[in-house]
A protein has these predicted regions:
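Short His-Asn-centered micro-motif
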Residues: 55-56, 108-110, 130
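Short, flexible, solvent-exposed loop/turn segments with mixed acidic/basic and small polar residues
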Residues: 88-99
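Short, surface-exposed beta-strand/loop "edge" segments at domain boundaries and coil↔beta transitions
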Residues: 61-66, 113-116, 137
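N-terminal, charge-rich interaction modules
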Residues: 1-79, 178
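A cross-kingdom feature marking charged/low-complexity
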Residues: 140-184
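Short cationic amphipathic helices and targeting signals
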Residues: 99-109
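Helix-rich interaction surfaces within compact, conserved domain-sized segments
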Residues: 114-133, 139, 156-165
């Protein structure tokens, strides 16, 4: 499993991500994203974007780090997105109980392979990635533990370790560029 995470840990993370509070900023207003629901405000704000993603650089590999280290990683992610010519907006994710919160970036119109590569490069197991006009989807960079099979809003992405090449499986057509398994 990526990042050395056990199936039990992946299941815990998935449950946490599915219930988290996601927000993105536009015109000074923080707007909500909910996994499994469409994002019409986002679609309206960026009508030309075919898809959207949300990611952080905090706590790579799910290893808790000091705030100063997470902020440094966040700046590195911003620099990388600038180099790649990506458009992005401030965002965050928080536990419903507010016991944790992470700075995130809403990425506008990311290419699927580039987005997955950023997630891997910054040690992120879970991101959000979905096509415009469709419900927000959780994208896990791991094999699906048995406890997580069946959620229709989770994509499980597995990359070939030896080559770094990803193979398509089943996901929305414009997001199926990695070996992606949707929960049945």
């Amino acid at each position: 499993m990526p990042h050395g995470a056990s199936p039990d840990r992946i299941a815990q993370l998935t449950a946490s991500y599915l219930t988290a509070d996601y927000r993105w900023e536009h015109d000074g207003v923080w707007r909500r994203l909910v996994i499994g629901e469409p994002a019409p405000e986002l679609d309206a704000a960026f009508p030309e974007a075919p898809r959207f993603g949300l990611m952080t650089a905090a706590n790579p590999g799910q290893q808790m780090r000091a705030d100063i280290d997470n902020r440094s990683a966040d700046r590195a992610l911003q620099r990388r997105m600038d180099v790649l010519g990506l458009r992005y907006r401030p965002a965050f994710v928080a536990a419903p109980s507010r016991v944790w919160r992470a700075y995130n970036w809403l990425v506008v119109a990311p290419e699927v392979d580039a987005f997955d590569a950023l997630a891997r490069d910054f040690g992120q197991i879970g991101t959000l990635l979905w096509s415009r006009g469709t419900p927000v989807r959780l994208r896990m960079q791991a094999a699906a533990p048995e406890a997580c099979v069946g959620n229709p809003w989770v994509d499980w992405v597995m990359h070939a370790v030896d080559t770094g090449v990803a193979e398509p499986m089943s996901a929305p057509a414009d997001i199926a560029k990695a070996k992606t398994v949707r929960s049945p």
